[in-house]
Amino acid sequence: MTPACPGCGLKLAHVDGIAPENYAASPACWATYGELTAYNMQRADPGFLHQLAVDAYAAQHDGPSSKAIATAFGLIGLYLTFEQGFNGREVQHAHAVLAGSRHDWPRLAAPPSRGAMTVADVMAALEGDERDDRLREWARQVWLAWSEQHAIVAGWLPDPQRLKRPSRWGPAHS
């Protein structure tokens, strides 16, 4: 076993490689996230559920070397999904709009625990609906773990619905 992942606490067998320094992640955790990414990309989900994985991973793996924008956008994506009903494509569009609007995203104090579930819990679920549901639950736990920061995140977006492009992708997948 390798040491626990600094972001989520996941303990997996050693994996050669490194995790990007802008995430507080172990190589094994990062490799598992890569497996989830590959799985999600081959599914071609029109609502782009994978955006929820991107945002949950960024928020759960915030660390001293993380870029403030990565954690902020992770939390914004979770807020837009769980509090505003956006699907992944709509969150992706909101991120694109917000990226050009501000350059000084603040660093928030991370909670001591960022959810009991990890990306490995998502990958342990059966492929298909069960894994999708597990991904949503993981992301929801990460969002709830940051509850002390919810008002700040909501304050960054005084009119979140203006960020919602008319959907061509069907109903939200949250």
Where are these regions (language model features)?
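Intrinsically disordered, low-complexity linkers and terminal regions
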Residues: 1-174
